[in-house]
Design a protein with these regions (language model features):
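PLP-dependent class I/II
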Residues: 1-191
Length: 191
């Protein structure tokens, strides 16, 4: 039996300290059981436009063509035109976006690292800090309390599965002023 590898590469362009994110496609042969999914959502800030692509073995082309034709039909015209512009002219936008996320990451990492109850790894990609908070056994309750008391929205780690319990996720895709303000509000809660 063949085991299929489904690779989510939606955040692959949002990497900070390497030239590019590793991909199974770099080592797979064309007919290997690997399907990589990608999207315009993250790299080109087209979230909600529902446009992406996949890379799959050529022998599966007809299968995906039928799925698309009968289940999806096709994306609206303006979204297709936007995707063409993103591919043709969007590299500067991606670079600037990644640089902004890098600044946000650095600010958030520096501030969270100084909070006594917080333990986190240095984020290498995307725009999230996923951190453990000492003494927490209900991340949803903590996220709700922090939202109620500080106005800062965090995702509870439990939303990502049982092993995420005790963690929180913070998005640093925001301006430095917004992030600094959020860190100021979080500090009393996480110290």
């Amino acid at each position: 039996k063949r085991i299929w590898l489904l690779a989510d590469e939606v955040y692959a362009r949002l990497i900070f300290d390497r030239p590019h994110a590793p991909s199974f496609l770099e080592i797979a042969s064309p007919e290997d059981p690997v399907i990589a999914f990608n999207s315009f959502s993250k790299s080109w800030s087209m979230t909600g436009w529902r446009l992406g692509w996949l890379t799959a073995p050529p022998s599966m082309g007809e299968i995906f063509e039928k799925l698309n034709e009968y289940n999806i039909s096709g994306p609206t015209t303006f979204v297709q035109h936007a995707a063409i512009v993103a591919i043709r002219d969007g590299e500067d936008f991606v670079r600037e976006t990644v640089e902004g996320y890098r600044r946000g990451r650095d600010l958030v990492y520096q501030r969270l690292s100084g909070m006594k109850r917080v333990h986190l790894a240095f984020p290498e990609a995307a725009f999230y800090a996923f951190f453990r908070v000492d003494g927490v056994d209900d991340s949803l309750a903590l996220a709700r309390r922090i939202l109620d008391q500080t106005g800062v929205g965090l995702a509870p780690g439990a939303a990502f599965g049982q092993s995420g319990e005790g963690y929180l996720r913070l998005c640093f895709a925001a301006t430095p002023d917004t992030l600094s303000d959020a860190m100021d509000r979080l500090e009393p809660e996480l110290n």
